[in-house]
């Protein structure tokens, strides 16, 4: 994405304090791989829950952008922290998908897995999707490309 003022903490590659998440498509899912550092901890060597929520929100927004070719706003996010994620983990996998649509409302499921493949965090989100034509006209967004 390249828009004037674009500096997303989740995905902007130029944001010096950002997570620099990159997404690709795997069937119905949008997927990212990311490695935490000690700068992302809450308790000693444990990935902060707020950082996990940020990752979940970002992946969910990307699934809307890619699968529906529009933008959306988060209305509700219900996160379940199932297992601690450690900041020295070899790398996380984030998976997000649209579970169902009702008019302009997307119901999204997103999960974070640790390097061993264990499900550590899962969330259900509700996003209000913007009208595609309005988004295209007002900000020039007509969809997005993902990493191959």
Residue map of PLM features:
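A conserved, well-ordered hydrophobic junction motif at loop->secondary-structure transitions
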Residues: 31-55
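Short, residue-level hotspots on alpha-helical faces of the histone-fold
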Residues: 11, 53-54, 58, 62
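A generic structural signal for short beta-strands and their flanking turns/coil linkers
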Residues: 17-19, 28-30, 50, 73-77, ...
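HotDog/MaoC-like acyl-thioester-processing domains
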Residues: 86-88, 99-148
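Hydrophobic beta-strand-centered segment that forms part of the acyl-chain substrate-binding groove
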Residues: 59-93, 98, 124
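Hydrophobic residues in beta-strands and at strand termini
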Residues: 34-36, 81, 129
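Non-catalytic linker/capping segments at the edges of enzyme domains
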Residues: 1-38, 144-148
